[in-house]
Curated annotation (Swiss-Prot):
This protein's name: Chaperonin GroEL
Organism: Mycobacterium ulcerans
Localization annotation: Cytoplasm
Enzyme class per UniProt: isomerase
Binding, ATP: 22-26
Domain of life: Bacteria
Amino acid sequence: YEKIGAEMVKEVAKKTDDVAGDGTTTATVLAQALVKEGLRNVAAGANPLGLKRGIEKAVEKVTETLLKSAKEVETKEQIAATAAISAGEQSIGDLIAEAMDKVGNEGVITVEES
């Protein structure tokens, strides 16, 4: 079961990165908690299929709530503010906003360590 759980957590992190580009740590912690509590409940006699259905319903509700509260990031200033929060530094947010302004929404920005 451990290998299956590790593979699932790895897949959660990959999908989160592919879809959102951020939040992999949060997704990994949540997935680990779900696996741990799920196994604990199954060991205590809970129906695994019932747990799965409950998790799926919870995912639907969380997704619905997140989509309702999501805000479009469109302007250069909004991009800079969002990137600064993610990077933890305003100057990096400004650089990312400038790069996005140059390449457009469909462009690719590659960041490398120097």
